[in-house]
UniProtKB/Swiss-Prot annotation:
Official protein name in the record: tRNA(Ile)-lysidine synthase
The protein's role, per its UniProt record: Ligates lysine onto the cytidine present at position 34 of the AUA codon-specific tRNA(Ile) that contains the anticodon CAU, in an ATP-dependent manner. Cytidine is converted to lysidine, thus changing the amino acid specificity of the tRNA from methionine to isoleucine.
CDD domains (alphabetical): TilS_N (cd01992)
E.C. no: 6.3.4.19
Family: Belongs to the tRNA(Ile)-lysidine synthase family.
Record SUPFAM superfamilies: Adenine nucleotide alpha hydrolases-like, MesJ substrate recognition domain-like, PheT/TilS domain
Annotated residues for binding of ATP: S35, G36, G37, L38, D39, S40
Organism: Burkholderia pseudomallei (strain K96243)
Amino acid sequence: MIPPHEFSAERVVFDALGVALSALPDDTPIAIAYSGGLDSTVLLHAAARIAGAGRCIALHVHHGLSANADAWLAHCAETAQALGARFDAARVDVPRASGQGIEASARDARYRALETMCARYGARTLWLAQHADDQAETVLLQLLRGAGIAGLAAMAPQYRPALADVVRMRPLLHLLRAQLERYAQQHALRWIDDESNTDTRYARNALRVDVLPALAPHFPGFRDALARTAQHAAAAQRLLDDLAAIDLRAVARADVRVLSRDALVALDDERGANLLRYWMRSLGLPGASAARLAEMVKQLRAARDAHALRVDHAGWRLRLYRDDVQWEAGDGAASEAARADVADDDAADARDDRADASAAARLPACALAWRGHEVWRLPGWRGSFVFSPVAAHEHDAVPEALLSSAALRACARAGGERMRTRQGGPGRTLKNLFQERGVPAWQRDVPLLYVGERLLFVPRIGVNRATHDGADAPGGWRRIEWRPDMLIA
């Protein structure tokens, strides 16, 4: 860390940004998260001078949490215009009952908005203005919360979240707030002060206002020491991630969204939890606490069937079907009836007759007079039927004449439906066909597609050959697909 008086404030800030710029291709746009506070004001001003204002895009997020939010937005727009930088802003609604606290909810909403705006301008790099004092606060806060290695690693100088296209860079992370203040004073910059930053009811503010000033006289180098702790933790976390990547290759199916339960529980508890943490992060799911991960491992070890597994996390549900472990959206997509159905794959077909008790069965039937539609969107089912033009007799293809011969209907299973999957084959229950294909019960709540009163197509099974036997027909042909809106990427 550079002592605050060793060089001029301008020199150290410009040097820090020069290092960040050297990692970027020439002339690429640089998005800057601009709140209007001291830190981001210094970052925007210095970036405009070093990189050129034409490359800079100041992005502001209006949370609506302060009565001054509109004034802050106007100030930021005016400042960016004066510097010659482009400016954009987004208004977000911060959920106050999300269960994760107002600070975390605001942070999540802010990053989502920033990444959306970055995409709008084709920016692949987002500069953030956190500095060494922020890093010290983060490390100490994580220590007091009993965080693990990942938490103690705190903020990385450069980081790209899983599934994200934008790299977050923190060019000022090794500089002190005092150095940024000196820069702002040298250039007579104007910035806003968020009144909430002094509210010590928030843990971070309490550390900044009360705790860190008390540490400074007794431990003058505490910021350097905490920064080194973060670096050591980051190195240890990289090793844990390397181990988890090795384990994931051994435990995952061909589709890495699915793990083998037997292979997972062959690992010891700590290694299994490490793998689950890494796997969840690779899927873009919210992180889980050590206690939550330990509970997942415990339940996976103890579960004798899928009905015994019950792990919900951040709107998702951990599922077990046969030997497959996977996450599914948990917002009502699966029913209690379907969960019970998993417990005994060999139960009588009569059990399937209870499908009308499921959440899906409560969805209204939908109808469509087909006139060459390529997509039939069904919002209630969170998906679409897709009718793609294909050559005759391709897999799951039917004649256009059949599709237009009567109204198409999409409705829930009533129980006891039967279909033929091959010409001349026997009629079989949907339950048997789902089981044969290894479709978990919670994925069986799908809309059945009828033409008139005849069952035509079932997602994850295919075309009913009792309705269309593959015979030649005049005109075009369409392949039918069901595409859910919500998939883990």
